[in-house]
Structure formats: C-alpha cells, structure tokens
C-alpha cells in the first residue's frame, strides 16, 4: 500500500537488531542480526553469535585486536539490521546442549557495559535465574549503561520455569 511505502521511506535507515533461539530435545537452533548476542554459559562463557558490526569486521580482517574493539569509537556501528533495508541476511546456527548449560541472550545495552567474565560470574553467582537476570541488568546500569538493556536467561534442563 502507499501508506506502508510512505512509512518505509520516512524510516529509511532505521532498524533493530535481533537474537532468537528455539530448543528441540537437546538441540538449540538460533539466529542473529546486528549486535544482539547469544552466549553459552557452563564451565565458562562463550559467545556463540557473531556481531554484525564495523569493529567486528575490522577484527576479522586483522585491522584491530579484539581487545581494541571493546573500546573502539565505532563499536556501535552495525552492518546489518532488521528494517534498515528491504531485506537482510540472517546468520543461523545450531548447538547441542548439555546438562548445566545456561543460555544468555542480550542486547548491546548489556554486552557493551559488562565484560564477558563478569557476565559469567554474575550468572553463576545467582541463587536462581531470576536473581541472575536482575543482577546483570543492575551491573550494566552501575557501569554507566543508558542504552536499552535486554536480557533473556534460559536453563534448558531446569525442572521449573521462572520469568523476570
């Protein structure tokens, strides 16, 4: 319709990032666009998604070191977003889960403000998944976070479900 076309023209260049996951039996299937991330936490922390950002490209091409990327002035420039163009390339992944795994999905409002090691210690130190989620948000705020802070924690083999 022409109304939808008008909205798209006015909002041209705007977009959002996304990370999504589904679990079937012991397999997790997940996807991302932009710099929203999925981490796997168990004995350590591992980022399973790749950021679609300018600094991530610079790291992949060897232009800067991963440590430099964390504080690079262009770290918020993303190279893919939903809605920025008529179509977008989505990265899809799969991972076999095991007992003790915890999945953390988050926006850059968390990952830009809290180092991976601190994320790990906060999640492992919580009494339960809800307390851990609240502590992650508080840590981002305490570190100066002003961006949207989106956090999802999943314990795939938990006996009960808790929602924050």
Where are these regions (language model features)?
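Short, small-residue-biased leader/transition segments that mark boundaries at the very start
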Residues: 1-8
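Catalytic core regions of nucleotide second-messenger enzymes
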Residues: 9-14
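Conserved subregion of the PPM/PP2C metallophosphatase catalytic domain
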Residues: 16-106, 110-164
């Amino acid at each position: 319709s022409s109304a939808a076309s008008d909205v798209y023209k006015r909002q041209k260049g705007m977009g959002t990032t996304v990370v999504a996951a589904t679990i079937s039996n012991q397999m997790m299937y997940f996807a991302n666009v932009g710099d929203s991330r999925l981490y796997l936490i168990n004995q350590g922390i591992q980022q399973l998604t790749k950021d679609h950002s300018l600094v991530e490209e610079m790291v992949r091409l060897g232009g800067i070191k991963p440590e430099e990327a964390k504080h690079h002035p262009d770290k918020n420039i993303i190279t893919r977003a939903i809605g920025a163009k008529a179509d977008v390339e989505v990265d899809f992944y799969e991972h076999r889960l095991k007992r003790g795994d915890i999945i953390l999905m988050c926006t850059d409002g968390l990952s830009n403000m809290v180092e991976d090691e601190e994320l790990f210690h906060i999640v492992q130190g919580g009494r339960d998944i809800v307390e851990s989620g609240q502590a992650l948000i508080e840590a981002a705020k305490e570190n100066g976070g002003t961006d949207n802070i989106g956090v999802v924690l999943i314990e795939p083999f938990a006996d009960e479900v808790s929602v924050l």
